Design a protein with these regions (language model features):
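Zn2+-dependent peptidoglycan hydrolase active-site motif and core
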Residues: 32-67
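Short, acidic/hydrophobic/Gly-rich beta-strand patch recurrent on exposed beta strands
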Residues: 11-13, 20-23, 50-55, 103-104
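Conserved, short, structured surface segments that act as functional micro-motifs
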Residues: 75-118
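Generic structural motif
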Residues: 28-38, 77-80
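Short glycine/threonine/proline-enriched tight-turn/helix- or strand-capping micro-motif at secondary-structure
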Residues: 2-31
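Short, conserved secondary-structure segments in the cores of folded domains
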Residues: 26-29, 67, 73
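Residue-level recognition of beta-strand microenvironments
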Residues: 1, 41-42, 69, 86-89, ...
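Envelope-exposed proteins and targeting segments
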Residues: 16-18, 26, 34, 47-49, ...
Length: 118
C-alpha cells in the first residue's frame, strides 16, 4: 500500500515508498516480470543501477539495485528474460541487505507494484 509509511533501517526513519524491496542474495538473476522494451539504464544514488522498461499502455516496470546488466536500451525482452543480477545495496539500503527494488509507473506516476504481481 503506497499510502502507508515503511520503516527504513538504514535511514532510521519511516517514509513512503513507491516500490517494494524483495530480499534476496547478491548475484541472484533478475527476470523481466512482463514483456517490454528497455527504455533506460541509469545509475541512481538510491536505487543503484536501474533498468526501466516500457511495457505498454503508459506503464513502466522499474528494477533497481542491479549489476551485470544483460540488456541494452532499446532491446525488446520477453517475460522471464534475465535483465541483470542483484548487486550490492546502495548506502540507502546497506542495513536492509541485498534486495531487488521493483516499482511500477503509469504515465510517469508511481502505482502500487503489488497490484501487478498478483
Amino acid at each position: 500500500n503506497m499510502d502507508q509509511t515503511v520503516y527504513f533501517t538504514t535511514l532510521d526513519q519511516y517514509k513512503l515508498s513507491p516500490a517494494i524491496s524483495v530480499q534476496t542474495v547478491e548475484g541472484a538473476p533478475v527476470l523481466a516480470s512482463v514483456p517490454g522494451t528497455v527504455y533506460s539504464i541509469e545509475e541512481d544514488p538510491q536505487t543503484g543501477t536501474t533498468v526501466t522498461m516500457e511495457i505498454g499502455s503508459g506503464y513502466q516496470a522499474v528494477y533497481g539495485q542491479l549489476k551485470d546488466i544483460t540488456v541494452e536500451e532499446g532491446d525488446t525482452v520477453t517475460k522471464g528474460t534475465v535483465i541483470g543480477y542483484v548487486g550490492t545495496p546502495t548506502k540507502y539500503y546497506s542495513k536492509e541487505g541485498s534486495n531487488l527494488y521493483f516499482a511500477m509507473k503509469k504515465n510517469g506516476e508511481p502505482v502500487d507494484p503489488i497490484a501487478y504481481l498478483l
